Design a protein with these regions (language model features):
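N-terminal subdomain of nucleotide-sugar transferases
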Residues: 1-71, 123, 139
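Conserved nucleotide-sugar donor-binding subdomain of glycosyltransferases
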Residues: 81-137, 173-197
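Short hydrophobic beta-strand element within catalytic cores of glycosyltransferases
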Residues: 331-334, 341-345, 361
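A short, well-ordered alpha-helix in the C-terminal region of glycosyltransferases
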Residues: 382-397, 403
Length: 415
């Protein structure tokens, strides 16, 4: 129990700087930080394996202490370092596949953990919240002294990496396929070792919750959905003869890179075959060179946008042709909240409480995607109905306000 008159102390271990908007992982971290800060003195331990981020003001207003664990070579696991230095490509690949832990765990060494405790001001916290299973080893020194330990599993890394392996194989990238398959297998072992050390596991959807229960019977699991801000009013650009397509995402994340390349390389050319004008905007953080190279006539790459609202206001359709991944897509929820009709793959919409033809249109290949896009473009009533139903669903189930209530109830055990 927390002594009377003292706010409980919480440690949030995050792979990215929390934020109110932008990157989906940063937004989820931001939701956790916001909920924790309401009732706790929060120490944020940033282990920036997913990037540092640029929302320091949002974070500083909510934390008691901000500690960053530098990911430096002197704290790198020597076993990983040895394999990474091999020059022969086959030996290099074999060593990375044989490394026993998931790759993001490679800095979780004794020197790094000692530095983490020092940076956090000690190892005792009433509540410890860890975002992503691969950060669990970095929280090891803090678990024994905590009375309430939560692990957020918003992305199903095993599933994501398995799907990535299949995607790489289809694209003729056997080395990347082998490495992704090896990483997926490592996560299976990693989960068995680390998940039982937490009092409560959190999933982003009922689909992932069921998968966790099946893999790890007896462990406590709850759902914390991804959420977005719902604006009071929705502004849309006037209709145009040009079909305006939008894709939003972290453009350094492989499933999003694959989606952007597919839209520009397959979908847009198919839609333009009849001579109709089509414009595409790809907006997101940290675009890889192959994404930047997509820019051309009618295709705009918007790198690191500070505000996505103008892009959603411009768009006729938001696309989510995701072919790999294991969480729920905040990009779809943002489009719903902005009143933009969505066309997605079944994997893209996986885990969301939505129905094909009621909240969005689902499609699997370029033919089906093109047909769905033209259906919405040619039927304003269909687009309006999908957008209205989707906005209602966000308000009912995925608003930031409702998400905060869910989180605060789960976090209140130590308060």
């Amino acid at each position: 129990m927390t002594p009377k008159g003292r706010r409980p102390a919480a440690l949030l271990v995050s792979p990215i700087l929390p934020a109110a908007g932008g990157n989906g992982l940063a937004m989820r971290a931001g939701a956790f930080l916001d909920a924790l800060a309401a009732d706790h003195d929060v120490t944020l331990l940033l282990v920036p394996v997913a990037g540092g981020g640029d929302s320091a003001d949002f974070t500083r207003r909510r934390v008691h202490r901000l500690a960053t664990l530098p990911l430096e070579n002197d704290s790198l696991d020597p076993l990983y370092s040895l394999g990474a230095r091999l020059l022969d490509p086959a030996e290099h690949l074999a060593a990375l596949r044989a490394y026993p832990r998931p790759a993001p765990c490679r800095w979780a060494t004794s020197p790094a953990l000692e530095a983490a405790v020092a940076a956090a001001g000690g190892a005792r916290f009433d509540t410890v919240v860890v975002l992503r299973s691969y950060l669990a080893p970095y929280a090891a020194p803090f678990l024994a002294g905590s009375s309430w330990r939560l692990l957020d599993l918003d992305d199903d890394e095993r599933l994501t990496l398995g799907r990535l392996s299949e995607l790489y194989a289809r694209r003729g990238q056997p080395e990347r396929a082998l490495l992704a398959a090896a990483e997926a297998a490592k996560y299976a072992v990693h989960e068995r070792a680390w998940l039982p050390r937490f009092d409560l596991l959190l999933a982003a959807s009922e689909v992932h919750e069921a998968a966790i229960r099946e893999r790890h019977p007896g462990l406590a699991v709850s759902v914390v959905p991804n959420t977005v801000e719902v604006p009071e009013t929705v502004r849309r650009a006037p209709r145009s003869p040009t079909l305006r397509l939008l894709f939003v995402g972290n453009l350094g994340y492989e499933p999003n890179v694959d989606a952007a390349l597919w839209i520009a390389g397959e979908l847009v050319p198919r839609l333009r075959r009849d001579g109709s004008p089509v414009e595409l905007r790809v907006a997101g953080s940290h675009p890889l060179p192959e994404v930047v190279a997509l820019a051309g006539p009618g295709i705009t790459i918007c790198a690191d946008p500070t505000d996505l609202a103008p892009h959603y206001a411009w768009a006729d359709l938001a696309l989510a042709p995701i072919r790999a991944g294991g969480g729920t897509r905040i990009k779809i929820l943002e489009a719903f909240a902005a009143g933009v009709p969505v066309v997605a793959t079944p994997i893209g919409a996986e885990g969301l409480a939505v129905q094909d033809g009621e909240h969005l249109l689902l499609a699997d290949d370029s033919n089906d995607f093109a047909t769905a896009c033209r259906r919405i473009q040619g039927d304003s009533l269909l687009g309006a109905r999908l957008a209205a139903n989707a906005l209602d669903r966000v308000r009912e189930s995925y608003s930031r306000v409702k998400g905060k209530v869910i989180l605060q109830k789960l976090l209140s055990r130590s308060a």
